[in-house]
């Protein structure tokens, strides 16, 4: 068992370094003015401009038979459409009670993830801009479990390395 874990770790690290080397070469080839345009594109895709991320109207759906809580229907629809474009199954909207029966009981430790959570404005007003909190989890399963159990939807997540 130890050898398999070591092998997986080495493969992941080599994949990470290979991806980083390819990214570094691409950055060196680009002109100076282009990265500004690229960063604008990244900002617009990470948070959809037509959805208010601070509007709280929780929606519940199944994501590959696992419960998922969304901040509002607009964010859920955009992410579901993106999944369809990628050839994955769309979200299945369900009630909160039904969704909670699909929360994982236990999660194994996997690749850690960092997620962004919307924090309401200090006044508690719905739709008013607040802040974004970042939290780290042992795996995507742990994130989905935490989010559904606590009715705390996340906006985005990304895999990270346990440094």
Curated annotation (Swiss-Prot):
Recorded GO CC terms: extracellular region
A single GO molecular function term of this UniProt record: bioadhesive activity
UniProt-listed GO biological process terms: puparial adhesion
Domain of life assignment: Eukaryota
The entry's keywords: Signal
Residues spanning the signal sequence: 1-18
Protein name: Salivary glue protein Sgs-5
Protein's gene: Sgs5
């Amino acid at each position: 068992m130890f050898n398999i874990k070591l092998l997986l770790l080495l493969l992941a690290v080599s994949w990470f370094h290979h991806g980083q080397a390819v990214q570094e070469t691409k950055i060196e080839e680009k002109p100076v003015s282009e990265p500004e345009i690229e960063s604008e594109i990244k900002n617009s895709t990470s948070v959809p401009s037509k959805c208010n991320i601070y509007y709280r109207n929780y929606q519940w759906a199944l994501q590959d038979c696992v419960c998922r809580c969304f901040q509002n229907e607009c964010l859920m629809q955009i992410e579901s459409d993106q999944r369809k474009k990628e050839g994955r199954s769309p979200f299945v909207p369900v009630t909160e009670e039904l969704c909670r029966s699909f929360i994982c009981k236990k999660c194994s430790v996997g690749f850690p993830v960092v997620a962004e959570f919307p924090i309401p404005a200090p006044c508690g007003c719905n739709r008013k801009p607040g802040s974004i909190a970042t939290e780290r989890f042992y795996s995507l399963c742990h994130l989905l479990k935490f989010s559904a159990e606590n009715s705390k939807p996340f906006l985005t997540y990304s895999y990270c390395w346990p440094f």
